[in-house]
Amino acid sequence: MQKKLLSILVLICTTLATNAQYTSLNAHSHNDYEQKQPFYLAYNAHFGSIEADIWAVDGELYVAHNKSEISAERTLEMLYLKPISVLYKQNKGKAWGDSPDTFQLLIDLKTAVEPTLTLLTEKLKKYPELFDPSINKNAVRIVITGNRPNPSKFKDYPGFVFFDGNISQKYDASQLVRVGLYSENLANFTKWRGMESIPEKEELRLRHIIDSVHGIGKRIRFWNAPDTEASWKILMKLKVDFINTDHIPELANFLKTNQQ
């Protein structure tokens, strides 16, 4: 088990170290469900990460930013799980028929961990060919953010479910395997708002955080980051793995014309 874990970490570190090119796979669709075409706009732009907020209400999982915005037709299954299933069938078990690439679905739990996470895993288990990498190597990666269980409870959930990490949290080796990503609030580390250069001291602090996360074979994104071209350039310079955006076409076009 230890050898297998070490091999996985080495492989991920190697991938991170060699992935110098930024593409749309480095793009994250923030609050994707608020787009005019939830899921499809980011998917068609070949985004590597898509975010959905969920609420558990009366045994169903609804997608919304606020509870007051819940509507009967906007369930996780209708907006994301079923469309993904249709595409995987069309593409013979892959996200995109002409590519081996896949993406992650970052699911933000807005209601309490339980029963929300159990309801979610029950729904995901209906689609093992979509989300379980032991069944399909091209599976969509599920990462849980928002309300999360204590790391000691990670093991209580299916192995295909990963969790958003926090740099202030300590994880043992078995828990770290279940950390699929680190997400941090950029405002906690810098007052920079995307227009001017980052102060050198704050840039060094960010680089240290990013390098530390990469050093354990994980990826990182910053939420609450300025959503501008100037900001995107700085985030690429810092080697942030996923660039947050609410502006899918603009970031997709930017990444095509500003590859590093």
Feature names for model-found ranges:
Residues 1-23:
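Bacterial Sec-dependent N-terminal signal peptides
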Residues 20-260:
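Phosphate-group recognition and catalysis centered on beta-loop-alpha active-site segments
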